[in-house]
Regions:
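Non-cysteine beta-strand/loop elements that form the S-adenosyl-L-methionine
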Residues: 13-15, 95, 119, 278-283
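A non-catalytic alpha/beta surface segment that caps or lines the substrate-entry region
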Residues: 1-6
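Metal-dependent amide/peptide-bond hydrolase catalytic core
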Residues: 144-318
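Histidine/acidic-residue-rich, glycine-tolerant segments that coordinate divalent metal ions
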Residues: 20-30, 34-35, 40, 47, ...
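Short glycine-centered, acidic/aromatic-flanked micro-motifs in structured strand/loop junctions
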Residues: 16, 62-64, 190-192
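Short, charged/polar, Gly/Pro-enriched secondary-structure boundary elements
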Residues: 7-13
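Short strand->helix junction
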Residues: 7, 21, 65, 195, ...
């Protein structure tokens, strides 16, 4: 964290995430957070050189652990806002976007990124040999049925006009080919753009797990929720300021309204305390060039990204 002041009446926070992702069992910057860090450092250096021109004091936040969505929560819990001489009245953040060409900035008023919750469900059965199934309670059956039925929660219990994802992405059970295991463990995620929908899906997921266990004589040994991230809802009050800064940085013709997505971003945690706005900053080649997404081995940030990002961040302050 850092602070730059000019005795201004208001303080604005700027945040960059700094962590890498694990790829082939080693840390790599396959999501561009190194560029986010460099952007904020560049903005800090420029603003320091123009300190007497500041319209706002600036709180700089360099945040770890965005990828596992725990970093922002940890900073807030450890008194982030109290560490600055003046509490910020707003916070702004950026993330590169390979689908947008360099020189384009994506903005959106309202819900931009999903509320996200990861879940873990453990079904408990009774071990036994495959030759005597009547003496076993196989936890794989209810776990598999649970995974299949989850898709029905979205298709049959949410409005077709309401965006939601509810999916299983890992399934682990057993080590032998001739014995019923004791446990079957599933993990997955719920992502929505409305809090009410999110709460409904969590309740129904719990109901479904218990029903599948009962139908197959198992028990639900564990149902836990992990890595909750709130809805990232860009402030309507900040939108004019955010749009003006983007237009000043790249020209109004290069500012585009973007659709919401179901990715999770723990920048939303800060927005529980202060109004916030989050941008997409183009990092792709544009045109007909293939897009290498985040977390892929072909991911790269194109030249010119840093200039756009630094300009945007400084325009928010000067």
């Amino acid at each position: 964290m850092a602070w730059l002041g000019n005795d201004c009446a208001e303080t604005i926070a700027l945040r960059a995430d700094i962590d890498a992702v694990t790829f082939d069992d080693a840390p790599h910057h396959r999501c561009g957070h190194d560029y986010h860090t460099a952007s904020l450092l560049g903005a800090m250096a420029y603003l320091k050189d123009h300190q007497q021109e500041l319209r706002y004091n600036v709180a700089f936040i360099f945040q770890c652990a965005e990828e596992n969505t725990s970093g922002a929560k940890a900073l807030v819990q450890h008194g982030l806002w109290e560490r600055f001489p003046q509490r910020p009245s707003a916070i702004f953040g950026i993330h590169n976007r390979p689908e947008l060409p360099v020189g384009v900035i994506g903005v959106h008023q309202g819900a931009l990124m999903a509320e996200k919750t990861d879940f873990r469900v453990v079904f408990h059965g009774q071990q036994g040999h495959s030759s005597t199934p009547e003496k076993c309670i196989d936890p794989i059956l209810p776990a598999a049925q649970f995974a299949l039925e989850l898709s029905n929660l979205v298709s049959h219990e949410t409005s077709p006009f309401d965006t939601a994802v509810c999916s299983v992405y890992s399934f682990h059970s057993g080590t032998e080919d001739n014995a019923a295991p004791l446990h079957a463990t599933l993990t997955g995620t719920i992502r929505t753009l409305r809090h009410g929908t999110h709460q409904h899906l969590k309740e129904r997921l719990s109901d479904l797990a218990q029903a599948m266990a009962l139908a197959h004589r198992c028990t639900v040994e564990e149902l836990s929720w992990m890595h909750d991230v709130p809805l990232l809802d860009n402030s309507a009050a900040l939108y004019p300021r955010a749009y003006a800064a983007a237009a000043a940085a790249v020209g109004e013709e290069h500012v585009t309204d973007v659709a919401p997505c179901l990715g999770g971003e723990d920048f939303a945690v800060y927005m529980q305390d202060v109004p916030g706005f989050f941008y997409w900053v183009g990092s792709g080649k544009g045109g007909d060039a293939p897009v290498s997404p985040w977390h892929s081995d072909g991911f790269a940030v194109e030249d010119g990204y840093l200039g756009t990002a630094i300009s945007l961040l400084t325009k928010l302050i000067l």
